[in-house]
Amino acid sequence: MKHLAFGFALMLVLAGCGGETSGSRSVSASGFSPLNAPFHYEGWLLQTDNSNVTRWVSFGKFNVDAQGNLVKLAGGPFEIESYGPNRGSTTYAKISIENSQVNSTPSASTLLAGPVTLGESPLSATDVQAFGTNFVGATGTFRLETPTASPVNTNGLSGAWFRNSALGASLNLPTLPSGWRYQAWATIGTVTVSMGRFTAVTSADSGNPHKGPGVAPLVPGEDFLAAAPGGLTFPLTGSTTPMSLIGQPIFVTVEAEPDPAVTPSQYVILRGVAASGATVGSSVVMSNQASGKFPTFSLTVF
């Protein structure tokens, strides 16, 4: 998903009723990316009705166009559809990723959230209703090796696994809430290839379609030995371009589940590149990329 930054502001006057206080609310946002249909973003407000039942009420579905403008699903500039029948009781807001245009409750894929109060109410990925973390403490390494080759480590610079020299898990990542998965990727030449989706760093990932005949380790990773996608030849050897994973970016993203795209999201958490001179068994330190990767959204009530 291509990262597109945008800004907008909407001013809406809400008429007070049933003892509610009249007021104006402005909405501002930036850093969202377009989602492939039928996926879209949706805003929600947590409200309590006259029967003291608390529920999430939608304030509109939206997406982002190629120019970075916030748009309604049917086209045209996004406008708040409704603040719900009990807007005066609103205490919380969140933005989710949805894959159905007919839904009465939010999906598990909450991207941003935060309490709503008088004044500015920013929604954040760090809120407990969203991820509960900014991911900037995440760390990791990967090891160049091909444990599924026969013999082991044949074409050993054609594989990358998230384990250390003691063969233990080498990623330190926050636990994700329901509705999200990590996914590892390798950009080999000009082609970005999935290395699998996972939630636990001490378990196998979602699959290893490019591995050799051997058994894969119980950690995320991939051997690029077989079933190469178009534009590549596996294994990566001295006669292929590129010749190995040296110089090829390996990175980890956060992806919605289900996923709006087969390409990496903008939410890149870790990235590493094996330097020239790396050998089979070398561990490569990954740098944290999380800062600024998540969008912002805020409500201002005054």
Q: Where are the predicted features?
A:
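N-terminal targeting/export leaders
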Residues: 17-302
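Positively charged n-region of N-terminal signal peptides that target proteins for export
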Residues: 1-5
